[in-house]
């Protein structure tokens, strides 16, 4: 996920070696500029980000930590468009969602992923197949609907408007909570496509119009999203293929250039691989600190309520231990795609694309982590702060690793644990205890 962007941030940070060195800051900003432009970030967005980072770094006194804090804060400001994150339900069901996007963007698959996400929130979902342009699109949605376990409404020899209208009637009569309509896509934007979408929108009067954008499309994707927004009005954007080797330009462009909120990200090829877009967590991954909170939420379904409650308390206090970490790795193997999960683990973000089709168990880095943890005493696993030099040497000897590798893993773990504590206490983020206590058969938290 945006690995080139993340690597560029690290390179920029390494340009600053001494405190209060303005020339070093200039070199860091120059490196940052090159990174942004290379990763398809629009020059206006790049200019704004550089201006923010420079002023905030100087205000705090030039240094690595000040630069890091300024970059993190500036990225958050740009990615946090009003209305970002999650799903908004209508006051009176059904909530009607119109999915739009170009052919090949992953729109139909994303439609099924959204249905799965809502189903996990105990919502009754109806899918409607209105993509009559692409061969087998209806059949694809039927297959995906069967996998998710939701009803798919489809009709033959009817116009798109008639199908949409009948699906809406069905959703109301059968008391569905949500109706999601998969509209037709095109290889390129044309008048016929927009006219059809306008007609379907008029029939449905949807509460949400979600545009599915391919994360690999860069500035072209930003332009397409803008055209759809101008023609039919878009309430939010879903970035598909977010787990791929995509550039960061499209995410920054959609939020800053267009002011459109990012609602979800497709984090893998499997049906469960759809995550609510949370700027704080994405920035955490970009900065190389992983995302322990999302990792914890991913494992919530395989944790019993007591485990979930205990883990959430530890995260809030910054007391996430190596035992917890090892336990999550064992449980998380059952969930989602490897690439999406790997990017959440501290220090493994750059391995996500390489491990797309690889078992977590076979990862060399994970084997190193497990070897290190298994070479610790029970006290050391529960109290990472006591790992002094002599203990680290003993652990290195027992695990077959170099002391430098032990130091690197512990440093990454410590950074991620601190970030998790900071994020769980930020205003606007749901109480993690509520999220973690969402074990199976429990009432889901109230949504936006």
Curated annotation (Swiss-Prot):
Binding locations of GTP: 101-108, 182-186, 240-243
Highest taxon in the source lineage: Bacteria
Enzyme class: hydrolase
Coiled-coil parts of chain: none
UniProt xrefs under PROSITE patterns: SRP54
Cellular component terms per the entry's GO annotation: signal recognition particle
EC number: 3.6.5.4
Function: Involved in targeting and insertion of nascent membrane proteins into the cytoplasmic membrane. Binds to the hydrophobic signal sequence of the ribosome-nascent chain (RNC) as it emerges from the ribosomes. The SRP-RNC complex is then targeted to the cytoplasmic membrane where it interacts with the SRP receptor FtsY. Interaction with FtsY leads to the transfer of the RNC complex to the Sec translocase for insertion into the membrane, the hydrolysis of GTP by both Ffh and FtsY, and the dissociation of the SRP-FtsY complex into the individual components.
Name this polypeptide is given: Signal recognition particle protein
Record organism: Helicobacter pylori (strain J99 / ATCC 700824) (Campylobacter pylori J99)
